Amino acid sequence: MLVKKIFNNNVLLAEDGDQEIVVIGRGVGFQQKIGQVVAQQKIEKCYYPKDQRWTTLFNELTSAIAFEYIEIASHIIATAEARLDTDFDDYLLIGLADHIQFAVARQLKALPIKNEL
C-alpha cells in the first residue's frame, strides 16, 4: 500500500494496486512522502471509497474536523457493526464525525439543546 495523498498527520489516501484507500491512524501520515509504503503498524481503520464524491467529502472533513472526532465516530461505527453484525455505509463516518463536533461545540459554548420529545 503506497501513499497517494496526505490529508494530515493522521489521515492519508493510499493506493493498493488500482484501489484507493483512506487510511486512518494516529501518526499514519506523519513524515510520510507520496509514493512511500504506508506504515502498517499505525493503521487503525481503512475505508474503501465507492466514488470520488466520498473522497472529496472526506478531504473536506479532515480539514474542517479535528481528528479526535473522526476517531470517535470511527470507533462508534466499528462497535455498532460488531454488536449488530452488520456493515454501515462509509458515508456514515462523515456525517457522524461532523455531528459529534457540532454537539461538542454547542456544549462548550453552553448553548441549550432542546429535545421536543
Give a label for each model feature.
Residues 2-117:
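A cross-family "folded-core" feature that marks the main globular domain of proteins
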